[in-house]
């Protein structure tokens, strides 16, 4: 009968080599009393839900039924080969193994290693009743118990890993939420700056765009010598639209007093500082932007007059400015002399 279970015997004999670090007799002889301070075991509450599922070993009736069927065939010389002795011996060994498991778990925090489990299996084997001559049943029961303990340890490891992964996931989600909040705050801080910059750009474009400059300068070109008489005509150009249909900004209607003061300031100084511009605007009851644009247009007109209209002093029309061409070297002196004579005759 015992030859029918060689794998179970080999499985029970294999792990004993790894449990040489502990003394089985010392563990069994005096089980350590767990002090209340040491009864802190992080994996134990997680281990509780798996206990009723894992602790009952796989049902032993399939191997026990053929044994029960073969029991009457044994010689009657052994009266203690009765079937009721089997479950009692199995249950007693299982109860002792459970007690030893609980004490080892309470005292050893690293109870997931392999050596305490094999020590429990060896201790259960020592405490069990002596095997009968056909003792294949008890070997099978011990093998099943060892398998159940291995399953418990594996499930406990799995539970601890699940708990760690869940904690890491929660931590990662918290970190992501904090980072997302920081990004939102930075966006909120950046948005007002962008809005202010766009508003300032729009205001600058609105007040000093190129569409406004040619209208005022062209209007002033019509009467270059009568800057003070521009006021009556400037009001009539209000609200005019260009060919593209874009509404142009209304032109400022300066009074004669304002134009006189602006001309005086421009005669004194072509470029104003910020403080001077604010003082002039406050004195003339104008905005600083209006003063700035008036000075820009006045400087453009002044540069045009200085460049092109300087020929009006000689009596020549300003639309035909005199073009000075450099004389090449190979031109004869006679030609140059005749050219000078023509120029002198042209003058009055």
Swiss-Prot record:
GO terms for biological process: autonomic nervous system development; axon guidance; branching involved in blood vessel morphogenesis; cerebellar granule cell precursor proliferation; cerebellum development; forebrain neuron development; hindbrain development; inner ear morphogenesis. Keywords: DNA-binding, Homeobox, Nucleus, Transcription, Transcription regulation. Its main location: nucleus. It is found in: Nucleus. Gene3D superfamilies: Homeodomain-like (1.10.10.60). Residues 181-198, 218-229 have a biased composition (Basic and acidic residues). The keyword Transcription applies. Residues 247-306 bind DNA. SUPFAM superfamilies: Homeodomain-like. InterPro entries: GBX-1/2 (IPR042982), HD (IPR001356), HD_metazoa (IPR020479), Homeobox_CS (IPR017970), Homeodomain-like_sf (IPR009057). Residues 59-81, 111-139, 179-251 are annotated as: Disordered. Expressed in adult brain, spleen and female genital tract. No expression in heart, liver, lung, kidney, or testis. GO terms for molecular function: DNA-binding transcription activator activity, RNA polymerase II-specific; RNA polymerase II core promoter sequence-specific DNA binding; RNA polymerase II transcription regulatory region sequence-specific DNA binding; RNA polymerase II-specific DNA-binding transcription factor binding. It comes from the Eukaryota. SMART domains: HOX. GO terms for cellular component: nucleoplasm; nucleus. May act as a transcription factor for cell pluripotency and differentiation in the embryo. This is Homeobox protein GBX-2. It comes from Mus musculus.
């Amino acid at each position: 009968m015992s030859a029918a279970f060689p794998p179970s015997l080999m499985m029970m004999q294999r792990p004993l080599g790894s449990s040489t670090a502990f003394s089985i007799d010392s563990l069994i002889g005096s089980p350590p009393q767990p002090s209340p301070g040491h009864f802190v075991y992080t994996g134990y509450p997680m281990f509780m839900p798996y206990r009723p599922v894992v602790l009952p070993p796989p049902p032993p009736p399939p191997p026990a039924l053929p044994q029960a069927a073969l029991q009457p065939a044994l010689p009657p010389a052994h009266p203690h080969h009765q079937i009721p002795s089997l479950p009692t011996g199995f249950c007693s060994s299982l109860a002792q193994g459970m007690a030893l498991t609980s004490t080892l778990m309470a005292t050893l925090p690293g109870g997931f290693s392999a050596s305490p489990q094999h020590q429990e299996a060896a201790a259960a084997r020592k405490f069990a009743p002596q095997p009968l001559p056909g003792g294949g049943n008890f070997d099978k029961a011990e093998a099943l118990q060892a398998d159940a303990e291995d399953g418990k340890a594996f499930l406990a490891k799995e539970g601890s890993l699940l708990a760690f992964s869940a904690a890491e996931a929660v931590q990662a989600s918290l970190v992501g939420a904090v980072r997302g909040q920081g990004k939102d705050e930075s966006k909120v801080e950046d948005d007002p700056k962008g809005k202010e910059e766009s508003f300032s750009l729009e205001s600058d474009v609105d007040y000093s765009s190129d569409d406004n400059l040619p209208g005022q300068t062209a209007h002033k070109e019509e009467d270059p010598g009568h800057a003070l008489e521009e006021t009556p005509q400037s009001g009539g150009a209000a609200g005019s639209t260009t060919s593209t249909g874009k509404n142009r900004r209304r032109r400022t209607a300066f009074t004669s007093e304002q134009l006189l003061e602006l001309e005086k300031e421009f005669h004194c100084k072509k470029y104003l500082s910020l403080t001077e511009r604010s003082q002039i605007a406050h004195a003339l009851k104008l905005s600083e932007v209006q003063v700035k644009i008036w000075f820009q247009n006045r400087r453009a007109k002044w540069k045009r007059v200085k460049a092109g209209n300087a020929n009006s002093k000689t009596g020549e029309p300003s639309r035909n400015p005199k073009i000075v061409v450099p004389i090449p070297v190979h031109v004869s002196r006679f030609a140059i002399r005749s050219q000078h004579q023509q120029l002198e005759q042209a003058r009055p």
